Structure formats: structure tokens, C-alpha cells
Amino acid sequence: MLTSRPRGTEDILPEEVGRWYLLENTAREVSRLYGYREIRTPIFEHTELFNRGVGDTSDIVEKEMYTFIDRGDRSLTLRPEGTAPVVRAFVEHSLEARGLPVKLFYLGPMFRYGRPQAGRLRQFHQFGVEAFGSRDPALDAEVIALAMDFYTRLGLKDLELHLNSVGCPACRPAHREKLKAYLRPRLEELCPTCQGRFERNPLRIFDCKSPACQEIVREAPTVTASLCPDCAGHFHRVQEYLKALGIEFILDEHLVRGLDYYTKTAFEIMVKGIGAQSSIGGGGRYDGLVAALGGKQVPGIGFGLGLERVLLALEIQGQEPPPEGGVDVLVVTAGTGVDLAAFRLLAGLRAAGIRADKDYLERSLKGQMKYANRYPARMAVILGEEELARGRVSVRRLDAGSQEEVPLAAVVDYCRKMKESGW
């Protein structure tokens, strides 16, 4: 057990890290293009934050949270999602005082207890954005566009945007009563979880994955048919903005998302043809969440995207990001009197922004060259006693097999120019 990772977790090995760099760098790049700034919150929070913020009828709170009592007898929970912690930070630090809107993004690990499967781990990673301070439907469209932009920059294809409105506190009560009236005669046919949701939050039954429950709600009254004029107008404008951006979408009246805080716009992004884990992200508007967590009446909208699912989708589509490479230059030594000069050369290469390394296992010249190819390195700079005495080094291009002598004093500049020319 000491040498086995916990079930539902993964080690990201060095050769896999390059894929994560690509995802994280793309997320940061596209977020900044849209005017979002990074925020980092603790990986654990007070349990009450998620009970109140995520909702006690959600699957997350009911059965997926990693909760523990610390030595101060405080109930703490490893964060299962990113929105509630960001909202907590927004309230705690009075970020609205700095001027609205406030547009933030985050990257980091989340934790949910569930059955591990491909693309669905107990420790997983999310990229998310949260925008506070505006009810403008254009902001909804911007948030959706940012998510779609992220995916397309990675090369993902066959994306489907599912869109719905889940209403607001003004129009949901009427739909709630219609839905309960429809479900009441078939209450005993619902799964035990949905039977428990019937009184507390029947809208969540639309989100149930049970085939029996899905069949029952197939003809159920949807919240879209009960929208108040404000919600209906808002939803119409969101669609207009998406059309103006050329973003195609599917109206999905059964889409409610799995969290209780959503109001008005809800969306989910799926990839066709990748099996059960076709949903790779989603989000929506939460105009009451900031106030519910003790802040002012500040509206918000955001999304959370699972990065493991993105990697799975890229792999299935043959668009998998390239693995992390080795180094640009391996400094190879021949003889015992060149170690200090080689070490100085290594430092000079790194100072010039060139990824460089050397052999620390005292291999032979032949062994070092094999190591350079296996690393892999683009070039080997070979420094021997005879070359050092003449102030020269040999530079070998490992891909082409060509080799030339270069003055030792000029080799760093030589390598820098090679890098600038694309090697």
C-alpha cells in the first residue's frame, strides 16, 4: 500500500507533463485575452461553504465530498468544485469595491468521491472562470465563447453546446408545482434519490442518470415553458449574441446542471463520439449565490471544465498534445580535466534560455551519446581535453548526425542562434 497511489488518483509523470503544460498555458492565454485574471484559493474550505453554496440536494454534497474534522474540531472539506471558493474569496476580500465587473479564472485540483473511470477521477483538475457584477446576457455569451475558444485552440472537434434557461426565484415556483403534479402519480417509480428530491428540489430529477427516471421526465413540463418575461427575454438575448458570434447550440430543455445555485442560463459542452464521458464542461449563471454566501446582491456567471476529460477527448480524436520533450543541449565530456569548464558551459547555456543538462553518472563518451539520444537532446556539445586546450568544442546535431567545431567562447551564442532559427 505504501507504494500504491490511492484509488481514483493519478501520477502525472514527467513525459506526460507537457500535455498539461499545453492545457494550462492555453487556459491562461485565452483567459487573459478575454480580460480575466487568475485567482488561487485553498484546496480545503469550511464544509458549510459547500453545503450552502453547492446545495444540500446536489450529488456533490449528498455523497461525493471528502470531509474531515481537523484537530481544532472544525469540519473541513477538500474542494469538490471551484465556484463556491471563488465566490467566498470575492465576498471575503470585498472584490466588488475594486470596481465591477470582476472577471477571474482558476486552475487546480478538485476532489469528489465517486466510482473512478476514464476521465472521471477522485482527484481531478478544473479550469474555470467566474465573472461578477453584470446581468447583461452578452456576458453569458462571452463566458460560453471563452470556453469554446479554449477547446478549439486545443484542436478539439465535434463539439456540441447544449443550452437552457433554468429560470429564477420568480418563475421557478410555478414550474415546481407543475412538475410535482406531473411526477406525483409516478413517485414510487422514481429512484430512491429522486424520491428524496421530490419535495426539496424536483428540478434536479431532470439531472438524474437513472434510465427509469429519464424515461419518466421525458414528457415532464420543463422550466423553459414557465419562464417569466425577464428570464425569457434574457434567454432570447443570449441566443442572439451566440448567433452573432457564429456559435452553434442545441436548445436542451432538460438541461439543469448538477448544482443548485444556477439561475437563468445553463449550458453544457459535449464531444460527439467519445462514449459515456461526452460531457467535458459546463456552467451557468448564479445571480443569487454571492448574497447567499453573505455578500452583496452581485450577479455572477461562470464555468468549470474538467481537464482529464479534455485530454481523453483529445486522445480519442487523435489530437493528443505532444509529450514533454527532453533538453536542447546535452554537454558531453571526454576526459577528467574538463569537468569545471563543462559545468561553466552548462550554466552559460541555461542563462541564455537554452534547456541544457549533462551526464552525472560518469558514463563513457559512447554511453553519454546514447544517453543524449535517449533523453532526447537536440544537440550534443562535446568537450574533451584536447578541444579544451585549443579553446574549441564539437557540436553534433543528433537528428542529422552532422558535427562541426565551434570556438568554446562562442558556443553559447551559436546554440542561441540555432534555437532562434528553429533548430
Swiss-Prot record:
GO terms for molecular function: ATP binding; catalytic activity, acting on a protein; histidine-tRNA ligase activity; transferase activity. One of its GO terms (cellular component) is cytoplasm. It is found in: Cytoplasm. It is an enzyme of class 6 (ligase). It comes from the Bacteria. The keyword Cell division does not apply. Keywords: Aminoacyl-tRNA synthetase, ATP-binding, Cytoplasm, Ligase, Nucleotide-binding, Protein biosynthesis. GO terms for biological process: histidyl-tRNA aminoacylation. Gene3D superfamilies: Anticodon-binding domain, Bira Bifunctional Protein, Domain 2. Its EC number is 6.1.1.21. Pfam families: HGTP_anticodon, tRNA-synt_His. HAMAP family: His_tRNA_synth. This is Histidine--tRNA ligase. It comes from Moorella thermoacetica (strain ATCC 39073 / JCM 9320). The gene is hisS.
